A protein has these predicted regions:
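The feature represents the first ordered module of a protein
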Residues: 2-71
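Single, function-defining residue in the core of a domain
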Residues: 74
Length: 108
């Protein structure tokens, strides 16, 4: 993954999309955010989509903040679980990429 920086917006840490040889796609976005809205200080969404755009894996911290703090979610196929945030967007993205690699090799 190229990890493309967010152009001219210094708050954007990563904004990238790549297509893998089997036609699946990885789309990642992460930015600094107001810690009052997202206590981690980041808003992110990492997605791995199959060739037919079926959601295979997604990490995110929701579209809206939660009253009791922030929730970090992992969606794998039809499964959902809360996960621990790795501490910063780059480390969390590394964890996601490792999982994408594993799933990709299992499927191909």
């Amino acid at each position: 993954m190229g990890g493309e920086e967010g152009g001219g917006d210094p708050a954007v840490l990563v904004d990238d999309e790549i297509e893998l040889p089997d036609g699946s796609r990885v789309i990642v976005y992460g930015r600094r955010s107001d810690p009052e809205l997202y206590p981690s200080g980041y808003k992110y969404r990492f997605q791995y989509l199959g060739p037919d755009d079926t959601a295979l894996l997604r990490y995110d911290n929701g579209d809206t903040p939660y009253a009791n703090g922030e929730r970090h979610d992992r969606h794998y196929m039809d499964e959902y679980e809360e996960i621990e945030f790795a501490g910063d967007v780059r480390s969390h993205l590394d964890r996601f990429q490792q999982e994408v690699n594993r799933i990709y090799h299992e499927r191909n």
